[in-house]
Amino acid sequence: MADARGSSSSSGDGGGGEGKGGAGHGDFVGGGQHNWYHGILGAVPPPNVGRQNIVHHQYPAASLIQQHHQSPTMPLPMAQLPYVPQYTVLPTPAVLPSHHHHHGQSQISQENFQDWVPSNNVAAPHVPSAFQDWRQMCNGSAFMPFGQTAANSNVFYQNLTFNSWTSNNMPRNPVYTSFHPAAIEDHHAPLFHSNNHDIDPGFQTNFRMDQAFVPASSPFPPVSSSSHSFSSAKISNGPTYTKKAKKSNVKDPPIVFRRSDMESEKNDDNPDQTPVSEPPSMNQNGENLIIRFNCREYRVILRKELTNSDVGNIGRIVMPKRDAEAHLPALHQREGVTLKMDDFKFETTWNFKYRFWPNNKSRMYVLESTGGFVKHHGLQTGDIFIIYKSSESGKFVVRGEKAIKPNAIMPVVDCSCKNELNKSEECGFTISLQTKKT
């Protein structure tokens, strides 16, 4: 029977049961829960101003305890998960038979693993083959599809051949991969310098030369368009034409310059400066005779000792004013005229620019474009510049003469004929060497 507080008492004990109920449970049996709830409400201070008052309709006591800043944190009981051991099945390396090497790939590709559909959770029967048990290796973590573990034996085996397995699970050329299974270690592509290119070429680079761009004078034979492709095995053997290159003695053809080629490049200001020796003619006295010019017609009209400015890089020789105005053509304009003068020593015609400069109500006559003549004859400061003029044709002959040092041999120019008795014979200049006396 229940008492006023809601506690039950046994019929045998009577008041003793009630006494035990009051002593054992007190306020927590029957109406004790109601009193305990109101006791907590009285002990908890009112919430602070501005703090959110959390009211939970189902568990008000828990919400009040959560608002109290001094309430201890009660850890929630957590059920401990059972320990599940992790198993990892490593692939078993399969040792390949010795007869299955590069040349045996065609036979391997014909052997198919048993097509198998999982049924009743029964593992597939063990079928021995040339690669032993590939399924153990395929059950490894490296070859398992997503969502399966190594412990799961329900694996769907495809129609697994050597060609399909290598094309679906790994690169075609396993030499350049960072990881490869140990079971296929013997099936690498052949090395770069191996000689098994007829069976499995592997990695190789072909070099082809379609055009014969080797010069004809080269010791190396030209490569025609029908040349074969050079594989890596041929390249590793070294140069093929080394011995032929050492034995060949190919010489370049001599370079020949023709005078007609040089004359086509010269202009009016820079005539041909190539010295051409003239076959000397001998007179009765045995002296060299220059018969290109008739010495009876030519006489000296100008003689100038060269200065530093005359032999400089400017290429200009200042003419003596008296001789220039007396024997050279008269100038009416400052720009001047072009004078053609034959070289006395060489078969060359020089084109000089003859002009004047105004100088204090006077004129200074110059002969320009003389740099080539000075260099050709090797003239220096102190050497002599001589001009001859024909009395009949009016042509000019120019001559450069080296300065005569004391006690040195100097050339003497005379007019001589082949036959002194017959004055109608051709005459020319003769050059004789004499010693200058001091």
Curated annotation (Swiss-Prot):
Biased composition (Polar residues): 272-285
Main localisation: nucleus
Compositional bias segments (type: Low complexity): 1-11
Ranges annotated as DNA-binding: 302-404
Alphabetic keyword roster: DNA-binding, Nucleus, Transcription, Transcription regulation
Biased composition (Basic and acidic residues): 258-269
Region span, Disordered: 1-30, 225-285
Domain of life of the native organism: Eukaryota
Keyword DNA-binding: yes
Gene Ontology, cellular component aspect: nucleus
Localization terms from the record: Nucleus
Signal peptide interval: none
InterPro entries in the record: B3_DNA-bd, DNA-bd_pseudobarrel_sf, LEC2-like
Gly residues compositional bias, start-end: 12-30
Protein name: Putative B3 domain-containing protein Os04g0676650
Organism encoding this protein: Oryza sativa subsp. japonica (Rice)
